[in-house]
Curated annotation (Swiss-Prot):
InterPro entries recorded: DUF7411 (IPR055834), Rossmann-like_a/b/a_fold (IPR014729)
Protein name: Uncharacterized protein MJ0690
Lineage: Archaea, Methanobacteriati, Methanobacteriota, Methanomada group, Methanococci
Source domain of life: Archaea
Amino acid sequence: MKLMDVHVLFSGGKDSSLSAVILKKLGYNPHLITINFGVIPSYKLAEETAKILGFKHKVITLDRKIVEKAADMIIEHKYPGPAIQYVHKTVLEILADEYSILADGTRRDDRVPKLSYSEIQSLEMRKNIQYITPLMGFGYKTLRHLASEFFILEEIKSGTKLSSDYEAEIRHILKERGESPEKYFPEHKQTRVVGLKKEI
């Protein structure tokens, strides 16, 4: 039986990594996609993690204007939530024109980025695609347990090491404008996969 290809938005973190593993175990063929906007090579970490996981990986470069607008929104709103949501929704809209099955690491407990039920319905109907969020049924404690079962993890403070999520390039643009990213992004921990504990 031919496996169905699914294109997974991938940052190299535990959530997008776990999503890819779950989809593989459900019988899909995960292709990992990391989005870059040409600001800095933030995709490097995701490339390393994709090799560890053994999945196909591709970097897609989108228009820098998307993250420039996100930086404008952060300065206007004084916090990053709406901007991160805008970038994520824009990315999904663009990718939905290219791929018939999309997935990401959105969790049940996430606030942003996260599509509402009606937004998911709209995306799937307008673009005639499937949008899968494998982690939506799991809470934080469960995901932490699952990730620790499969992965060797590295935890870093946000902004201290180049990551492959949207935040990295937005932070760089804010710095280019003479703004301090720490003024807008609350301090938080980011976790990335640096090895496997068991075969996937």
